[in-house]
Structure formats: C-alpha cells, structure tokens
C-alpha cells in the first residue's frame, strides 16, 4: 500500500447517508460490519462498510485529525446471534 490513509464510507442503516471513518486495517472489505464510535458521546455502533478509498495526506476528503477511527471488525458476538447447535 503506498497511500497514507484508508477512509471507509459506512452507513448506520441501509439507504441512509454515509460517513467517513479512518482505519489502518487493510483487511476490511466492502460489505463488512465494523464497530465505530458514533455521535457526540462516542457510543459504540455497528455499521456496514459501503466504500473504501485510499488517499495521500494532501488529498484526504476530511482532515485526518478530525475523522473518527474504526474500532475493529465485528464478530458474531457483536450481533448476539444464537450459536448453531
């Protein structure tokens, strides 16, 4: 990877406005669910990645220092899914 920043566009609900979050995890793919800090109180929220863009520092769409970071990729435990028997 030769770019400085990975910006992921995420949606909180399907069809809603997308928001940029930064990540250093280049294993995240479009369609993945990730955990992010959301709102003024930075509560944790599960969102879906709808686009991934790579930028050099001079080309970032939002200042990196003002952009929140993805916490991590989601696991089954984040969805409280029943375990298969």
Located regions from the model:
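Terminal, basic amphipathic appendages of nucleotide-handling enzymes
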Residues: 1-19, 25-26, 30-85
């Amino acid at each position: 990877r030769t770019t400085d920043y990975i910006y992921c566009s995420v949606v909180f609900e399907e069809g809603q406005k997308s928001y940029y979050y930064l990540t250093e995890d280049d294993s995240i793919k479009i369609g993945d669910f990730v955990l992010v800090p959301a709102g003024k109180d930075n509560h944790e929220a599960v969102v879906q990645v709808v686009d991934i863009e790579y930028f050099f520092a001079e080309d970032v769409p939002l200042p990196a220092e003002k952009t929140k970071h993805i916490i991590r990729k989601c696991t089954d435990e984040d969805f409280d899914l029943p375990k298969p028997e």
